[in-house]
Amino acid sequence: MTGILCFPPFARFFMLLSGCAWLAGVSSGTSLVASAFSDENQLSEFVHVAEIAQIHRNLRGHINSAIIEANDTSEERMQPNNVVGEGKAPSGAQETVAQILVKGMNKVADFLKDLTRSQK
């Protein structure tokens, strides 16, 4: 079986139905998303969910960059020429990592403040 016949009957029906919705949307000059959501409330909820997903990605990016920066600084300070005693980093290295993490969290907090201001 090849082509559309390899799909189960319910999938073929869904593809046919979505194709009809797409054709109806194209023929009336509306966008595909607008034709899929007949109610404006549904469309605004869809946009809201997409915005929330983007916010989560941005927050993850800020947090990950702070962690990467902290790890890089920690690894630089843990080089053999900087080691004090038996494989221990100088006490300043731990403070620096903590300070970098705090800076990263401050960036996240600033991002959230800007976000709440833009939502008002």
UniProtKB/Swiss-Prot annotation:
Tell me yes or no: is Glycoprotein among this UniProt entry's keywords. Answer: yes
Q: Which residues are glycosylated?
A: 71
Q: Where is the signal peptide?
A: 1-29
What triggers or suppresses the expression of this protein?
Expression is up-regulated in spores.
Provide the alphabetized UniProt keywords: Glycoprotein, Host cytoplasm, Host nucleus, Secreted, Signal, Virulence
Q: Name one GO cellular component term.
A: host cell cytoplasm
Q: Find motif (RxLR-dEER) and give its ranges.
A: 57-77
Where does this one sit in the cell? Secreted; Host cytoplasm; Host nucleus
Family to which the UniProt record says this protein belongs:
Belongs to the RxLR effector family.
The protein's name is Secreted RxLR effector protein RXLR-C26
Native source organism of the sequence: Plasmopara halstedii (Downy mildew of sunflower)
What taxonomic classification does the UniProt entry list for its organism?
Eukaryota, Sar, Stramenopiles, Oomycota, Peronosporales
Q: Which gene encodes it?
A: RXLR-C26
